[in-house]
Amino acid sequence: MNQLYNGMPAALMGGIVWRKSHFSNPSGNCVELAELPDGRVAMRNSRDPEGPALIYTRGEADAFVRGVKSGEFDDLIT
């Protein structure tokens, strides 16, 4: 596997299993996440599956998910 870096094309991340929320839009407009072999977490837009992926440490991903769960971003979608 190539060295994984922030912003790299997701298409070059061979062998990565992408997951999305069960609450996601069935038409494919979703945020997808994947665990990388080194434990980091990659994020991509399902509308552009070969496009750039953002890569976060586990701590960064954990802080984001906790913020989502606690409603910190609700004002952006309501």
What are these regions (language model features)?
Residues M1-T78:
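Positively charged, low-complexity terminal tracts
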